[in-house]
Amino acid sequence: MTDTNHSSMRQHSLQSLAIAAIGVVFGDIGTSPLYSLKEAFSPAHGIPLTPSAILGVISLLFWAIILVVGIKYVLFVMRADNNGEGGVLALMALSLRPLNPKSRITGLMMALGIFGACMFYGDAVITPAISVMSAVEGLEVATPQLSHLVLPITIVILIALFWIQRHGTATVGKLFGPIMLLWFVTIAALGIYHIARAPMIVSAINPYYAFSFMSEHVLLAYVVLGSVVLVLTGAEALYADMGHFGAKPIRLAAYVLVMPSLVLNYFGQGALLLLDPKAIENPFFLLAPQWAALPLVVLSTVATVIASQAVISGAYSLTSQAIQLGYVPRMKILHTSELAIGQIYVPVVNWLLLFVILCIVIGFKSSDNLAAAYGIAVTATMVITTILAAVVMVKVWNWNKLLVAMIIGVFLVIDLGFFGANLLKVEQGGWLPLGIGALLFFLLMTWYKGRHIVKERTAADGIPLAPFLQGLLAHPPHRVSGTAIYLTGNDTLVPVSLLHNLKHNKVLHERTIFMTFVTRDIPYVKDHERVTVHDAGEGLYIVKAEYGFNETPDVKAVLEEVARQRGMTFELMDTSFFLARETVVPTHLPGMSIWRERVFAWMHQNAAKPTDFFAIPANRVVELGTKIEI
């Protein structure tokens, strides 16, 4: 095959991935024109709809997109991939790699990363609510007599969206790219039409209008910044979803289609306001002629459902990562596709999200009311991403510190400006994502600290495995047929379940395997590096299985690899899995306060059973209880 053919195939693949990315990555930021400009000129802000104010706000929107999306995320942050994977937890794991595990900065970076992940959940409960509601509110423009149905229709759409999650979205997901492609072309066309009617709006490209607006209104303009940030919602998704599509397709889609379409639409809305300031009632839907209003409502609703789907899938992926990294208790994770490894469904997360989202929709009642709650979670995550990226630039890439200070300084000024403006909205609704984020942060840190204490207590009371096995083989107990697999969290200590089995049953299986799962700070582990088997003699094997934080441990696959390496065969019905069921007992021992220990004990008790998490047949499991005082 010629180089030309290779090149054309790569180009075709890049374009296909870019279209697929449009359907997943850009849904959130792509639907922000539905409410962003309307919220910026909210009557509560008191900004007059004069030509200079309109040009000033549009200029702010334009430069926010260019600086934050086009330069910060697409050019800089997307370079900081963890073996191809993006997202705040992947970035945190990358930033921790060169640091001393016991240093204060390590603890700070870890706390920042976890808090950023928690704020994502605060964002995840608002995005579906505000996106779907703002789309359905288009009915008030298209058919005003149906305006009383906005809330019920929104609720029905959201319930249906979460209900279908357990069946997977692989089939319908193939349509996401083409639909969002149509969406971006549509909003660009609507914008171009109105720009042609009021070409004066193009002068908003000049940053003079943004600075002039800021200097003329000062305090009011700072408040407006809290609404301007709504055009950036979903910018973090460009980085978080990088592992699914790669940096090149996302950059291609961002620069060629998404950013131009967004800019054209915002400028079109600005042009409409120059022509008719009363259009601020709903500037997005009033861009369309009356005959196209209803089709636009339908397309908008589908686009917001796709945007919501991306956030929901992101919540599943983030939860899975957090479980593997040890920040969240085990949860049942179901794979909804045999072909796509990332297609997962986490029932607990799904129904909790739906419950909170429905409460938000019913409580806030309109997208205008909800807009105040939106933004603070986004800007908090943006600030955290910038700080973590700075650590990576200095410690991992070894960039010049002065250069890093200049780059990060500019980004932090922008990010902190947006974050500060959104703090002004805490009372109007910003308390919601902050409260959700703070609660989750407390729970995750409690779980992480509690697991650390449990490991310390277990290690202190544990017996080293190697000398124990030597003594065991020197004076062997009665051997019985079959295979015993002891799942253990530490491959250097004797599993408590083995000690209990020897104490009560006084037998040892003819083939005994000690299996440990280890999560590394990379997203995926190569197959040939995953499983190591140490033969301890006399049918005793120590197996260590390594997984990335984007992978789910698979006992069956590990056994198949052990069988391949050692020429064994495993009959599942002739294999027993021994697990230690830990009961955590809160005490006044050093570690955590007693009330936090009780919270940890409750989380520990309600974590998914190892049999569910590791997909082990329940009828082949022997659980032996042990108490751990913390």
Swiss-Prot record:
Parts of the chain that traverse the membrane: 17-37, 51-71, 105-125, 144-164, 175-195, 218-238, 255-275, 283-303, 344-364, 374-394, 402-422, 428-448
Entry GO terms, CC: plasma membrane
Pfam families, per database record: K_trans (PF02705), K_trans_C (PF22776)
Subcellular location: Cell inner membrane
Domain of life where this protein originates: Bacteria
Topological relation to the membrane, as annotated: Multi-pass membrane protein
Keywords: Cell inner membrane, Cell membrane, Ion transport, Membrane, Potassium, Potassium transport, Symport, Transmembrane, Transmembrane helix, Transport
One GO MF term attached to the UniProt entry: symporter activity
PANTHER family: LOW AFFINITY POTASSIUM TRANSPORT SYSTEM PROTEIN KUP (PTHR30540:SF79), OSMOTIC STRESS POTASSIUM TRANSPORTER (PTHR30540)
Family the entry assigns: Belongs to the HAK/KUP transporter (TC 2.A.72) family.
Function: Transport of potassium into the cell. Likely operates as a K(+):H(+) symporter.
Name of this chain's protein: Probable potassium transport system protein Kup
